[in-house]
Every structure is written in C-alpha cells, then in structure tokens.
C-alpha cells in the first residue's frame, strides 16, 4: 500500500483477455472519448486526478496486454499496483472464462487472497451479441469476493463508477490494515503492562521473603 500512503496516489492495473476493450475503458475514463481502433497494448500508463467522496486522489493507471506470452511482465505489473480492474467482454464467453486465470495470478504474485479487485463486463451496449449474462458476471464476482459492474466504453456507462469504486476498495483495505496495526500495537502495550505488573508482584514477594528471613 506504499503508493496510497504517498499523497493519496493510487496505483491501479487493468487486466483481461485481448480485445475486451481495456484500453477503450481506460481512455474513456481519462479523456472522455471512445477509441474505435488502436494497436494492441503491451503497457501504457495514464494519470488522472479525481475527487472521490470529497477526497482528492491521483490515479496511476497501468493498461496491460492480455497475451499469454507476457505472463512474466504481468507479474511485474501486479507487484507495482494496489488495486485491479479485471475486464471481460459480455460478447465473449472465452474472455469471461479467463477471469479466473487473471484472478489466480494476482493472488499468487501478491501471495494474498485479500486484494482489492473490481471485475467489469465491457460492451454492455452490444446486447444483441451478448454471450455472458449480467447474473453470470455477478455470481462469478461474488464467488471470488470481487466487486462487479457491467460497463460500456462506447457510451461511457458506469466508467466513472468503476474507477471510483476500485479506489474505495483500496482505501477500505488500507484503513483496515492501519486499524489492525493500531490494534496490534495496543495489544502489545497491554501485554507489556501486564508483564510489568506481574514482575513487580514477583519482586515484591521476593523482597517480603527476604525481610522475613
């Protein structure tokens, strides 16, 4: 969580199969326009300042490639980020099936199941071409403990909400982490205080015995 602690900089990683519209989602959020055609991404980084729940954040967004041969690079991307947006296309059953692979990779690289992840089904405007229902997406997200939304990079539907909610997930984890650290610190102080009192009682008992002798 080092980035979040640094002036509310939040590092997010966009992951998913090739062709699902990761770049279109990112550019729509950053620049408020829809890109129809673009070269396949290997790695692009974007920054945007935004206000979420009356708090100013600087989002550092890493748009990544979906190709299998870039797995080693993807490990590096994962290590550098705090929150994740996993993208599939509602018009592609295979991209939906790949979500489990990306989720497992994140958990493996970070060695944790407690990672802020938002799963999104892009291209919700193409309902006639839909292969994955909203309920299927919702059920998978619930199974994996992820937040979920359907979006459209073309119409901008839910684009702002996706990034806002992902930042909230990162913040909740950071706040909980700090709360746990504070609790641990208080528990240690309490334990040390008890030990100190016990030692004082032992010493007092020893002194009493010595005086009696």
Swiss-Prot record:
Pfam families: Ras. A lipid is attached at residue 210 (S-geranylgeranyl cysteine). GO terms for molecular function: G protein activity; GDP binding; GTP binding; GTPase activity. Coiled coil: none annotated. Residues 211-213 form a propeptide. Belongs to the small GTPase superfamily. Ras family. This is Ras-like protein rasX. It comes from Dictyostelium discoideum. The lineage of its organism: Eukaryota, Amoebozoa, Evosea, Eumycetozoa, Dictyostelia.
């Amino acid at each position: 969580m080092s980035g979040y602690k640094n002036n509310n900089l939040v590092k997010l990683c966009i992951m998913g199969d090739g062709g699902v519209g990761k770049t279109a989602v990112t550019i729509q959020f950053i620049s408020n326009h829809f890109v129809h055609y673009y070269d396949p991404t290997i790695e692009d980084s974007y920054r945007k300042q935004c206000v979420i729940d009356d708090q100013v954040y600087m989002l550092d967004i890493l748009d990544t490639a979906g190709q299998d041969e870039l797995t080693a690079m993807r490990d590096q991307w994962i290590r550098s980020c705090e929150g994740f947006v996993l993208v599939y296309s509602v018009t592609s059953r295979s991209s939906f099936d790949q979500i489990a692979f990306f989720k497992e990779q994140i958990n493996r690289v970070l060695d944790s199941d407690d990672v802020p992840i938002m799963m999104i089904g892009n291209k919700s405007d193409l309902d006639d071409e839909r292969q994955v229902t909203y309920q299927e997406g919702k059920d998978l997200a619930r199974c994996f403990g992820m937040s979920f939304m359907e979006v459209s990079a073309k119409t901008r539907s839910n684009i702002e909400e996706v990034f806002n909610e992902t930042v909230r997930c990162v913040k909740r984890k950071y706040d909980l982490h700090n709360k746990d650290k504070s609790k641990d610190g208080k528990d240690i102080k309490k334990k040390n205080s008890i030990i100190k009192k016990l030692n004082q009682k032992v010493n007092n008992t020893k002194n009493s015995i010595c005086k009696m002798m």
